[in-house]
């Protein structure tokens, strides 16, 4: 039934690409069921940006385009490679902003938090939805700072493709390697954009070679630059054999002309492009059998006759297979090369239906979605970003959370436009939605339509497992792979201005933890103080700043400290008995455990549980959860520093439980026995060891190396990058605190560095004793 749908926007707000007056109303004929009377939208909500303007489309085609026309992509790179600037240009050329946002001016759309705009870095990934030439693009702008790798991980989990942005003068940098590995883990097809081609020192050849050498990827050169550094003025489309030149008189880069390369006008450029195109055809033919057969059968004599469409289709297949990566170039800041990049996104990156998600066979057409991000809004409460893999989401829909085993109701459904949110009637598979009303859903939770739907999918998965003779529990595979949360490496105490503000602080921290699972909060059992644990100095600083800005609390941070770990060096046994009478009930437990060291390569705390054959299976069945809770509790705080225990195996050798003994008493006895064993053993402090990469001018190399030697640094190699030297090595985290200030002083502000957690290593006895004495107040 055709109906008139009114879209209201209240409260006189400015939205990129549109200016909404106090009340603006558009009538749109849409083939939809009649909707209930709707309350006008509040602050930061609007009608769809695409609906306001001259081009008014049908509501359904705007909200739910064909799945083949959807692209869920992310932008990933090293810090300062130009991710946010590239995103702002994409939004501008797609028509969703009317002016060019600039990181340096602090007026970008995707960097919508105050700290992001002030610091010129991206912290939280803003999801942006826009259209480009008939395609719906859901774009995630991700951070490049090492303190915020969880944001990258969280977003990569739900992407179908990605754009890797590189600084053309630096090539592949430290954080690029980290993000590239994360994308490999999720099998995400990528295209590369060599940004900053206008920058002094930019080198297309060097950047391409670094992709080949450092990322072990096969670059497909789809473009060549016309000039470099100050002479950069455009790009050559290798596939089409055309040159793209931007109008020098145009400040916004919208005006550019595409001209075919002709022998009379550009003989040298035509020759170079022809050679590049022939090399591209040969490279793609080596990677794609279907294309190789086509070339050999019809175009082996003359590659010039090969239609561009055939080559583009083959490049699309190769990109999806991840056997090579298309490479484009430009300058986002100078507004060159962004429109061809958008064309490449729609042409070469996959649609949701081209991605092979095995779990979809179990859900059929039922709802299956992943909650990949949670934000907290003061007016609307928790906002949950979801990637919809199958089915449809609507407002007032009851959904089942498999992880939490609970049912909740979506009150409102929004389409994200940075910090502007558009209310919509439904979203289908392939889209990214923003939901309101889910108070118990957390990052990484799997969402389905109902508990019965989950059970039906579990039965299908189980049958599939039996066919393939799988040993693992197939029902567990219904849970979509969640976000791997890294362990924090720094911690500090945080105190409110007064005891009366403690509940407010706890509320603020609870909200921030829902948004950022890499932020850990714990209570120190000795001092009773609240302890913040984070991924780095900047991470802790940002959290402190947000508590002040968003919750109005002037908190006080204690000194920043390194998060050490502890382990043991030898095997020990311990026995403990707990005998208590509460009321008229006696609780009696006797436990014997053995603790021994194990070797692992994980940076996550590893504790293994084992049970001796002599343990009564019936007794173990009713008490296993209590036993393992007790072991886990004992390993949270080691005997030396109170740091977590890792790389230890605990074996339960004997267990005697008096009838009627509570599980709480069992846990308490096991915990006390394990702690006794850990205290008896020879103990070792483990410190976080960081991968370090310092990029420094040749003139300042010597003082930087001398300083790193004093910091117990272990230099692995020194590379040459253009006119700079790149120092690569390892350094203990404790020695690198405040290093940015020192490095600026040593190099007159010309050097940069990147850190990433490598592993935990044993401290030498002298450093360990110094640390223990300092913590105990003896020094």
Swiss-Prot record:
This protein may be expected to contain an N-terminal transit peptide but none has been predicted. Widely expressed. It is linked to Combined oxidative phosphorylation deficiency 39: An autosomal recessive disorder due to mitochondrial dysfunction and characterized by global developmental delay, axial hypotonia, dystonia, dysarthria, impaired intellectual development with poor speech, and deficiencies of the mitochondrial respiratory chain enzyme complexes. Neuroimaging shows abnormalities in the putamen and caudate nuclei, along with subcortical white matter involvement. This is Ribosome-releasing factor 2, mitochondrial. Signal peptide: none annotated. It catalyses: GTP + H2O = GDP + phosphate + H(+). InterPro entries: EF-G-like_DII, EFG2, EFG_II, EFG_III, EFG_III/V, EFG_V, EFG_V-like, G_TR_CS. Residues 68-353 form the tr-type G domain. Its EC number is 3.6.5.-. Mitochondrial GTPase that mediates the disassembly of ribosomes from messenger RNA at the termination of mitochondrial protein biosynthesis. Acts in collaboration with MRRF. Promotes mitochondrial ribosome recycling by dissolution of intersubunit contacts. GTP hydrolysis follows the ribosome disassembly and probably occurs on the ribosome large subunit. Not involved in the GTP-dependent ribosomal translocation step during translation elongation.
